[in-house]
Amino acid sequence: MIVRTLDECRNSERRVVADNWESVRMLLKDDNMGFSFHITTIYEGTETHIHYQNHLESVFCMSGEGEIEVVGGETYPIKPGTLYILDKHDEHYLRAYKNKEMVMACVFNPPITGAEVHDENGVYPLVD
């Protein structure tokens, strides 16, 4: 059994900080569960281009407000209780509204190793 707290993970190398977001990676590839689990904060008033070409992701909004815009498609509002699933490697823009920092619970398949950040194309690399 694996038991971890958000606080202990936040105060370790499992916390990764980027320009528009920070992510506490609570479950990673080395845990051998077949997926990874993160609590990610999207900073207020930001827009992040993301295109997970190597991963599928499901995201549940726990707090805050924003929107997700699928490139070439629709824009969907995000608020607490919203789940969105990137089941087609959807290229998108994630926006947190001003004064509405979003806290999200995220699941990735395949799992990430922990140190990944988006490259210039919004992609996480696939690491064996």
UniProtKB/Swiss-Prot annotation:
UniProt keywords, alphabetically: Lyase
GO MF annotations in UniProt: ectoine synthase activity
Catalysis: reaction(s): (2S)-4-acetamido-2-aminobutanoate = L-ectoine + H2O
Pfam families: Ectoine_synth
GO BP term, pick one: ectoine biosynthetic process
EC number: 4.2.1.108
InterPro entries listed in its UniProt record: Ectoine_synth, RmlC-like_jellyroll, RmlC_Cupin_sf
Gene3D superfamilies listed in its UniProt record: Jelly Rolls (2.60.120.10)
Keyword Glycoprotein tagged: no
Pathway: Amine and polyamine biosynthesis; ectoine biosynthesis; L-ectoine from L-aspartate 4-semialdehyde: step 3/3
Family recorded in the similarity comment: Belongs to the ectoine synthase family.
General function of this protein: Catalyzes the circularization of gamma-N-acetyl-alpha,gamma-diaminobutyric acid (ADABA) to ectoine (1,4,5,6-tetrahydro-2-methyl-4-pyrimidine carboxylic acid), which is an excellent osmoprotectant.
NCBIfam families listed in its UniProt record: PRK13290.1
Stated name of the protein: L-ectoine synthase
